[in-house]
Amino acid sequence: GVASGRNAVLFGRLIKIFGDSRTRQYIGFDTFDGYTQKELLQNPYLAKKNHLWKVASKNEVLKRCYANEVGDVVELFEGDASIEVPRVLKEHKGKKFQANKARFALVYIDCNSYSAAINSLKSFFPYLMPRAYIVIDEKIQGGETEALLDFAKQHRLSVVKPGNMQVP
């Protein structure tokens, strides 16, 4: 998810700091209105904090990106990631990629939901560069962690736990 756009700005700045703005971009997916009804039914524990993810509209996040001078390397897509990710990858001509020809060095999953995470991983997998990273950002283990572990097992990928952390 994109939420307020903090990671869009962070990754946008990293793209620029490393001089990759001619070849790389950040793409983000979010409903901008909390979890979908389907997600809430599948993951009832998400309902308690659903209001926390209704903090900014897509336009507000884009304004934040332009205010932080990264709007030119950021694209945001609104809707259910399970639907939007495969559609965008197959059909959308991005700022730095052609439809159905994108290649990614990093996929950063921050959605807290198993189905959104696993469906996004399945959609991005054919577009990953060799030795690409799949990273999750989950404060309380749940859907993302489970999706990553299931996906890694299905595809015989190694899961790295940085430092002395006991979770992926």
Regions found by a protein language model. Give the residues of each.
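S-adenosylmethionine/decaboxylated-SAM
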Residues: 2-168
